[in-house]
């Protein structure tokens, strides 16, 4: 069967695009499974600890003996969905297979800990070991998996026919991974990205969408949202009732969103200067349309890195007053210890990755999707391997996963700039980054900031997101939402499980912040709306027509660039 509904939010967290930190997507995903220097250090470390290593292997042998005798008490955790079928524990043979698998996995994990590697080598080795363990799970084996065997009996083997067809289709074109969502259930502009609005500015780089107010009164200062550049913009405008943009305009906040054009090889030279310049153009257009000299601005993931650099440029040129408020959504500006991806990166690979994207003229979003899936294969490869191929069923219907599959390309120039920015941690040191002829110093961005992170986010870990409170020069309000990455943002008030943590202070240490944080039940969307309301001026009558300041509607939302392939 398709993954249970309760698991969709978790899968969405893990399926969100990486954008910036996945700096080596161009080199291909399976390269990570090849032994490297970290693997050699691991082997040497174990060889230098023969007593400890021997004790671990002896314990494994003893446990395997207990498994064979039927006296082992090993059992998979209840939360491990791979072994939820009662047959895994009720069938004597299957129980022994699972117990042997668990025993070997625990021993491997203990050996990695025994090696006492530094944090980077430890993460690299654990990545390899955990991924191999996921691949070798008995749940991935046809007929050994009891659900697969039952499906074969019930359908007279038709499940394997359907699964084989799906496998051939998925492997025929990028990304060569199991399909994660039933894309036939969604259509952009029909049941997703449907909040009414119009394109009021179109350049070769972007379309600017103004959303139609849905209240009689609106706040005079509008909000501009800057999305990532490797997926389409509508993560903030998903299905009705789950759209942040819809929520904003239904509550009196004027909203604009950038929709990036999908670049091709001809646009290879577009770099950070190009995209910051485009955001400046959009910001100017927002102010013209609304007849104001200020706007609030926020971004999402890597889009917020571009927005942050734009804010730094405004500060350097004496125009920061144009920003009434600033937001950072699941964004890492300080890449110190930036999680697994930071550990996996190395200079040689980064140079090769930039060379590959330069030859193509772009980084293909499908390569990025494939690489990201192999970062969490247990959930993003093997989960769907079982559902799609062994059971012969369709993947789930879920709007975030549909958005995630709708990838775009990133220009070679921007790819190289993101790689250098992340690896050299340029935003941490004032003046290390120069954009449009100005040195960027984020401490000069003293606009009030609203930051959101996901507590389960392994792409942009919340502790790394929190460090932005120390980089920016203004007063920050930090929100720690449930879930991870994009699912932390798609958190409407109708979600009964929604909650978030907040504190009145922002100490330097994120763990100290957590100790003082209070848990609020419900969505953080109303909190953000109230925060914006305090900074977005007085209410005024909503405009009757879209456009203004010499800009007129060019097309209905969601525009035309969102359909580029």
Enumerate the predicted regions with their spans.
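Cap/lid segment of the alpha/beta-hydrolase catalytic domain
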Residues: 215-289, 339-340, 492-509
């Amino acid at each position: 069967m398709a993954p249970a509904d309760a698991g969709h939010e978790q899968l969405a967290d893990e399926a969100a695009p990486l954008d910036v930190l996945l700096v080596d997507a161009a080199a291909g995903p399976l390269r990570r499974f090849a032994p490297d220097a970290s693997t050699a250090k691991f082997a040497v470390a174990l060889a230098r600890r023969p007593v400890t290593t021997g004790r671990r292997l002896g314990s494994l042998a003893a446990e395997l003996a207990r498994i064979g005798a039927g006296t082992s008490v090993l059992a998979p955790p209840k939360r491990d969905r791979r072994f939820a079928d009662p047959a895994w524990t009720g069938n004597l043979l299957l129980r022994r297979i699972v117990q042997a698998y668990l025993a070997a996995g625990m021993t491997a994990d203990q050996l990695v800990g025994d090696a006492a590697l530094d944090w980077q080598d430890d993460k690299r080795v654990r990545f390899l070991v955990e991924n191999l363990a996921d691949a070798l799970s008995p749940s991935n084996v046809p007929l050994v998996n009891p659900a697969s065997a039952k499906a074969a009996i019930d359908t007279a083997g038709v499940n394997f026919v359907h699964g084989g067809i799906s496998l051939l289709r998925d492997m025929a074109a990028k990304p060569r991974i199991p399909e994660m969502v039933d894309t036939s259930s969604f259509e952009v502009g029909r049941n997703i990205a449907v909040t009414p609005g119009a394109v009021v500015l179109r350049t070769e780089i972007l379309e600017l969408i103004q959303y139609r107010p849905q209240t009689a009164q609106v706040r005079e200062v509008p909000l501009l949202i800057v999305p990532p550049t490797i997926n389409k913009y509508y993560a903030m405008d998903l299905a009705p009732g789950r759209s942040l943009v819809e929520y904003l305009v239904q509550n009196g906040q004027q909203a604009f969103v950038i929709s990036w054009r999908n670049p091709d090889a001809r646009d290879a030279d577009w770099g950070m200067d190009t995209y910051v310049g485009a955001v400046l153009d959009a910001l100017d257009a927002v102010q013209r349309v609304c007849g104001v000299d200020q706007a609030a601005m926020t971004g999402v993931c890597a889009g917020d890195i571009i927005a942050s650099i734009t804010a730094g440029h405004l500060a350097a040129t004496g125009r920061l007053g144009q920003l009434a408020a600033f937001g950072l959504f699941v964004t890492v500006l300080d890449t110190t210890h930036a999680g697994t991806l930071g550990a996996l990166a190395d200079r040689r690979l980064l140079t090769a990755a930039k060379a590959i994207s330069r030859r193509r003229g772009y980084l293909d979003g499908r390569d990025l999707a494939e690489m990201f899936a192999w970062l969490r294969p247990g959930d993003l490869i093997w989960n769907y391997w079982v559902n799609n191929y062994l059971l012969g069923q369709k993947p789930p219907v879920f709007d975030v996963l549909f958005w995630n599959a709708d990838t775009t390309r990133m220009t070679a120039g921007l790819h190289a700039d993101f790689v250098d920015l992340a690896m050299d941690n340029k935003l941490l040191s004032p003046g290390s980054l120069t954009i449009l002829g100005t040195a960027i110093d984020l401490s000069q961005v003293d606009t009030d900031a609203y930051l959101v992170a996901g507590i389960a986010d392994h792409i942009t870990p919340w502790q790394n997101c929190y460090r932005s409170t120390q980089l920016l020069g203004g007063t920050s309000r930090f929100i720690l939402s449930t879930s991870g990455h994009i699912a932390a943002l798609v958190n409407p008030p109708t979600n009964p499980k929604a909650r978030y943590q907040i504190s009145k202070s922002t100490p330097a240490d994120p763990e100290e912040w957590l100790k003082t944080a209070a848990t609020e039940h419900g969505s953080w969307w109303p909190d953000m709306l109230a925060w914006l309301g305090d900074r977005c001026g007085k209410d005024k009558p909503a405009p009757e027509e879209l456009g203004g300041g010499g800009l007129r509607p060019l097309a209905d939302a969601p525009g035309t660039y969102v359909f580029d392939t």
